[in-house]
A protein has these predicted regions:
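Gram-negative bacterial Sec-dependent N-terminal signal peptides
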Residues: 1-20
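Short linear recognition/processing motifs and adjacent strand/loop elements at protein termini
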Residues: 3, 20-29, 33-34, 47-49, ...
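Soluble non-cytosolic domains of exported or imported proteins
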Residues: 34, 109, 219, 223, ...
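Extracytoplasmic/secreted envelope proteins and their assembly/folding machinery
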Residues: 75-77, 88, 250, 402-409, ...
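Sec-exported extracytoplasmic/periplasmic mature domains
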Residues: 234, 406-417, 439-443, 474, ...
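Active-site histidine-acidic residue metal-binding/catalytic motifs
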Residues: 361-437, 441-445, 455-458, 462-464
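Solvent-exposed loop/turn segments at secondary-structure junctions
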Residues: 381-384, 395, 425-429, 451-456, ...
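Active-site-adjacent mobile loop/cap segments within catalytic or ligand-binding domains
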Residues: 441, 445-448, 452-456, 467-470, ...
Length: 555
């Protein structure tokens, strides 16, 4: 994932001549940010000084630069000059957006459920929220804002600024539009909440209409992902915020991934005998149900734990077919409406799993280790619409990922490993299309090849190294092994190994890792990234590491 986009290129693809000798790739001439600093990425020929606001900046032996500068709130001017060439940059630093008054969108709840109203207001104010004759006074709360998730990538994941909020909770709210009144120094300001509150006694039952529908911990894409729901899953809705539905077991799902169905009773099921079968290089465990119910899956070392929601066990018999992956299957009714199944594995490494409903039977398919490994390589980005990060001279990430992935594919093929590339040219592929290719091809492992950049508050001049990103526990060992081997054998710095919710790390069908093989924006590391001999050496070491890991992990 790249956090910035640069200005139009001053270079010609394929190694053409620069139109001018001073190049600033980032930030664009006019840029808006909430960061308290900004880095400037660019290059100029050696033999002269590059100045920013009249002061010389450090450059690499290749002439590249990436200094950072503090930003004040409002407009900031940076003048980058080299000889007679001048590039002016205007960076506007804005305050982070304050949370809107609640409800920010239409909220539907059952009567008697706790409703918490809140609004930002200056300290010392008197604040109340009203709805016709209904009113409630709110109390001041001094609250620290959370840093963005991207702050982990710049090692600045500390709490943000203090926000002055006024809050109050009640179970006696009424339906309608709410208006906030803020009294400050004998002045009254009124502010309507953007959304409305609707109290509803009855809620519908929905069925999931898309394959592996996304569920989250809250009503929006800012909330964490939970286990996707297979197509056909049925559940009762218990609330709604905007276009997000809250399901009975606690997860939220977008309304567009569902449709309302008529049911006389809530979708609750019993479960009795459980069976299994070997089919197509995997062991399928079959859970016959009266109705397709929501599921949750948790993966641990040597364990895969499946939870069936809205289910009561009547199980007396379980048959586990002889197979190379699952050692034992146990279950426990952990709550009156929840059954937990623990699959204990024979080996430490798990090779992927999928879920689907066949009518009312949940099929949990556990993949066997491959007798002939197949590696999917995804060269990150592609096409003029998705350049990725760019080096100091404007060279795009999309081109170097394709070069390295192609070299790596040849090295792996020479070792007898089957390889599939998500792209072999300049195709324009969205991340979800690449992830779907992983699901369709079902490789032994999937590697997405990338090169790195930073958010605006990063230290571009001093951040370099190889990083690896994983999401499911089955991918952690691969990410750690490749990261450690590359940093050791190539004598490269470590950026780190990260758990990260990325499209190319989320597929469950195979261990999937996203590699960031260096920083495009780093003045010195960029030279290593684009050096043909270094690219060949990287491909060779990476192929050897993949082969070794596959050999060690298959038993």
């Amino acid at each position: 994932v790249k956090w910035w986009q640069g200005v139009s290129l001053w270079w010609v693809v394929g190694g053409g001549t620069l139109a001018q000798s001073l190049v600033v790739v980032y930030p664009p001439p006019r840029h808006t940010t909430t960061s308290d600093r900004i880095f400037v990425i660019g290059t100029a020929p050696l033999g002269g000084d590059v100045l920013v606001n009249g002061k010389p900046i450090g450059r690499s032996e290749f002439g590249h630069f990436a200094p950072s500068f503090p930003l004040q709130l409002g407009k900031n001017q940076l003048r980058v000059s080299y000889g007679n060439e001048v590039i002016d940059l205007t960076i506007e630093r804005q305050k982070p957006a304050l949370p809107p008054p609640y409800p920010a969108q239409t909220v539907i709840k059952p009567p008697g459920e706790l409703v918490c109203f809140s609004i930002p207001a200056p300290p010392g104010a008197a604040v109340e929220v009203t709805n016709g004759n209904w009113r409630m006074e709110l109390s001041p709360v001094s609250q620290r804002s959370l840093p963005p998730n991207s702050a982990v990538l710049t090692h600045r994941a500390t709490q943000g600024e203090t926000v002055s909020l006024y809050q109050g909770c009640t179970r006696q709210a009424i339906s309608g539009k709410y208006i906030y009144k803020i009294r400050m120094q004998n002045q009254i300001q009124t502010m309507p909440a953007p959304g409305a509150l609707i109290l509803r006694e009855k809620f519908p039952t929905i069925v999931v209409t898309t394959d592996q529908a996304i569920t989250r911990s809250g009503p929006g894409t800012d909330f964490s992902r939970l286990t996707p729901l297979p197509k056909g899953t049925q559940a009762v809705v218990t609330g709604q915020e905007g276009t997000w539905l809250r399901l009975e077991y606690g997860a939220w799902i977008e309304q567009k991934d569902t449709k309302t169905i008529e049911r006389a009773t809530p979708p609750h099921s019993r479960i009795r005998g459980i069976s299994s079968r070997n089919r197509g290089g995997q062991t399928e465990v079959l859970f016959p149900l009266e109705v397709p119910v929501p599921i949750s899956i948790r993966q641990e070392e040597r364990k895969l734990i499946l939870t069936l929601h809205n289910v009561t066990a009547q199980t007396d018999t379980i048959f586990l077919v002889e197979n190379p992956v699952i050692d034992r299957l146990d279950f426990q009714q952990t709550q009156p409406d929840r059954v937990e199944y623990t699959l204990t594995m024979k080996t430490k490494q798990q090779w992927g799993y999928t879920t689907r409903y066949e009518n009312n039977t949940l099929v949990l398919a556990i993949r066997h280790p491959s007798t002939r490994p197949k590696v999917l390589l995804d060269p990150g980005h592609g096409s003029k619409n998705d350049l990725g990060a760019r080096g100091p001279n404007g060279y795009p990430e999309k081109d170097v990922t394709l070069v390295v992935a192609t070299l790596l594919a040849k090295e792996l093929q020479n070792k007898g490993i089957d390889v599939v590339l998500t792209r072999s040219g300049d195709e324009d592929l969205f991340p979800h299309q690449r992830a779907e290719m992983i699901n369709q091809i079902a490789p032994t492992i999937a590697l997405s090849i990338h090169y790195n950049a930073l958010p605006d508050d990063g230290d571009a001049e001093n951040t370099e190294g190889i990083g690896a990103f994983w999401y499911h526990p089955q991918s952690h060992a691969l990410a750690k092994f490749l990261h450690d081997r590359l940093t050791d054998k190539l004598n490269r710095k470590s950026y780190g190994v990260f758990w990260h919710n990325l499209a190319l790390t989320r597929p469950t069908i195979a261990p999937a890792v996203l590699l960031e093989l260096g920083f495009m924006i780093h003045p010195r590391e960029f030279a290593w990234i684009v050096d043909p001999k270094s690219q060949q050496q990287l491909a060779k070491v990476l192929a050897e590491s993949i082969t070794e890991w596959l050999s060690k992990s298959s038993f």
